[in-house]
Amino acid sequence: QPRLIEGLENVKDSFNSYPLDAVAQAVGSAALSDSAYYEETAKKITATRDKTIERLREMGFSVTDSKTNFIFAGKKGVDAADLKKFLEKNKIFVRHWDAPRISGYLRISVGTDEQMEILLSKIREYVSR
């Protein structure tokens, strides 16, 4: 049975790409039990997301409408995979997929206002070179 358990441990994340450990579950449960905190945090994230979307669109990016804590954005003439590498060199981490329909886009998680300003600044730097 130890080999079976080891095998299951090795593949578990391939079925659930966003696993939550017990600590994350406890923190999430506590956050949801404080509805005032939850509402305030949701408002901040929404405002930051919407402001970032607006700024990306001003730079010519196509951005899908979002009701989540992430932004899906791309720009014609900008190599999304190369932009991802540029951002990583600047310690900004986004996601990119090679699938043909979405290879020109990045998935950007919404951070704090300050983090998103840094992201926008680096994207502006990249597209203006």
Q: What do these predicted regions represent?
A:
Residues 1-56, 62-64:
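PLP-dependent aminotransferase class I/II
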Residues 7, 27, 74, 82, ...:
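Phosphate- and divalent-cation-binding pockets in alpha/beta enzyme and binding domains
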Residues 9, 13, 33, 76, ...:
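A generic structural signal for secondary-structure junctions
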Residues 34, 80, 112-116:
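Alpha-helix N-cap/loop-to-helix initiation residues
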Residues 45-46, 58-90, 106:
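Conserved PLP-binding catalytic core of the aspartate aminotransferase-like
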Residues 47, 51, 82, 118-121:
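Alpha-helical scaffolding segments of alpha/beta enzyme cores, especially the outer helices
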Residues 85-90, 95, 99-129:
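PLP-dependent enzyme catalytic core of the Aspartate aminotransferase-like
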